[in-house]
């Protein structure tokens, strides 16, 4: 199973002081040596972390394929088409959100998404759609001309954190998930089942399947063991771990956990 390392959070740290350090470009050889298969970046409309200068240099200098997350805004699609990353992953975007909150509305935004895909593919860029694990949405994805879907694991990750970490006892507790352990365990089983079923259906529909969002060293094993998922994109937890262990070791450890889980299924 492939690991895409999202390096946005290196730029988040830089932007906290609005200077040029740390530079995300310096992560590229370290991430590669540690065993990652892909670099992932998100060029947001508000440029809150990765900016156009970063994106251009990362795509130019990365010897690993670059997966560029972006919205379906026509101006952004034009920029991505010019930059020519290996892949573009289309994601929903709201300016006020802290991080991407849900999957693309592929059914409601079908025409706009199809237009974006057509433009990107004309520039020889593979396209993935970041979606909730929903069968109807996957059926629509298969018709858009996309090559891949990335299943949104955020709901699974949130339930897992409320069940197996101290999140519920902190200021970041998720109010909608302040439930009994039994209820959380039931919800977790459903979330895992939804992801497994979505991965199976997407693969049968001829789509490649990735997954990501909220994955960390504790919760990644279950997802990495799913047979139809071929790639995981993980960022914040790796960059957070790198503060303590260094970036090389943080990436290496994540890759090791993923590989071990993959051998178990």
From Swiss-Prot:
Predominant localisation class: cytoplasm
Site (Transition state stabilizer): 150
Key words, A-Z: Cytoplasm, Pyridoxine biosynthesis, Transferase
Active site: 42, 69, 213
Catalytic activity: 3-amino-2-oxopropyl phosphate + 1-deoxy-D-xylulose 5-phosphate = pyridoxine 5'-phosphate + phosphate + 2 H2O + H(+)
Any one of the GO CC terms: cytosol
Localization in the cell: Cytoplasm
EC number: 2.6.99.2
Pathway(s) the chain acts in: Cofactor biosynthesis; pyridoxine 5'-phosphate biosynthesis; pyridoxine 5'-phosphate from D-erythrose 4-phosphate: step 5/5
GO molecular-function term, one example from the UniProt record: pyridoxine 5'-phosphate synthase activity
Purpose of the protein: Catalyzes the complicated ring closure reaction between the two acyclic compounds 1-deoxy-D-xylulose-5-phosphate (DXP) and 3-amino-2-oxopropyl phosphate (1-amino-acetone-3-phosphate or AAP) to form pyridoxine 5'-phosphate (PNP) and inorganic phosphate.
Name by which UniProt lists this protein: Pyridoxine 5'-phosphate synthase
């Amino acid at each position: 199973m492939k690991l895409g390392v999202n390096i946005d959070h290196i730029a988040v740290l830089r932007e906290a002081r609005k200077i040029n350090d740390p530079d995300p470009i310096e992560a590229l050889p370290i991430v590669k040596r540690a065993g990652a298969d892909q670099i992932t970046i998100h060029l947001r409309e508000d440029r809150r972390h990765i900016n156009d200068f970063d994106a251009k240099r990362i795509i130019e200098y990365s010897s690993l394929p670059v997966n560029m997350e972006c919205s379906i805004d026509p101006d952004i699609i034009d920029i991505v088409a010019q930059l020519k990353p290996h892949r573009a992953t289309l994601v929903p975007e709201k300016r006020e959100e802290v991080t991407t909150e849900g999957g693309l509305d592929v059914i409601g935004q079908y025409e706009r998404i199809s237009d974006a895909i057509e433009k990107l593919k004309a520039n020889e860029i593979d396209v993935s759609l970041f979606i909730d694990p929903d069968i109807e949405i996957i059926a629509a994805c298969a018709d858009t001309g996309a090559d891949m879907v990335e299943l949104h694991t955020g709901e699974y990750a949130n339930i897992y954190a409320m069940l197996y970490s101290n999140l519920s006892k902190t200021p970041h507790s998720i109010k909608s998930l302040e439930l009994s352990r039994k209820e959380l365990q039931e919800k977790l089983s459903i979330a895992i089942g939804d992801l497994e079923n979505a991965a199976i259906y997407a693969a049968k529909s001829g789509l490649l399947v990735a997954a990501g969002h909220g994955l960390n060293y504790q919760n990644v094993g279950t997802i990495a063991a799913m047979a139809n998922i071929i790639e995981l994109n993980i960022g914040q937890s790796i960059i957070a771990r790198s503060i303590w262990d260094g970036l090389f070791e943080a990436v290496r450890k994540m890759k090791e956990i993923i590989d071990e889980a993959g051998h178990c299924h």
